[in-house]
Amino acid sequence: MISKVKIGAQVFRVVERLREDDGMLSEGSLGYTLDDENLIVIQKNLSKSKKQVTLWHEILHAARMAWESNVRPKKTDEYEVWEHYFIGLYESVLLLVLRDNPELVDWLREED
C-alpha cells in the first residue's frame, strides 16, 4: 500500500486502519476521505485487489473535492450535459494523478 498520493496541488496521506479501531469504517464502508485533513483511510484487512479498488474510489472523491466548480448543470438538463459535466470534472485531475504518482500506478497494476 502506498503512503501518499498527489491529487492536483494537494498531497493526501493514505493510511490503513482496522474497522474496530475507527468508527468511520462502519459496516459497509471500506474507506473514506477527509478533505480538510488531506487524509484517505482504507480498511486494513481487505484483500489487495479490494484495497486497490477502494483507494481508487477514495482518490475519485478527493479529485472531485479538489476540482469541482460551483457551476453545475440544472437537474432538468439533458443526460449529455451531465455526462460532459462529469467527464470535464475528472479529465484533467485523473491525468495529473496518473502522471504525478508512478508508484500508485505500479501498485494498482500489481495482482493479488
State each model region's role.
Residues 1-50, 66-112:
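Metalloprotease/metallohydrolase-associated module, dominated by Zn2+-dependent proteases
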Residues 53-65:
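Active-site recognition of the HExxH zinc-binding catalytic motif
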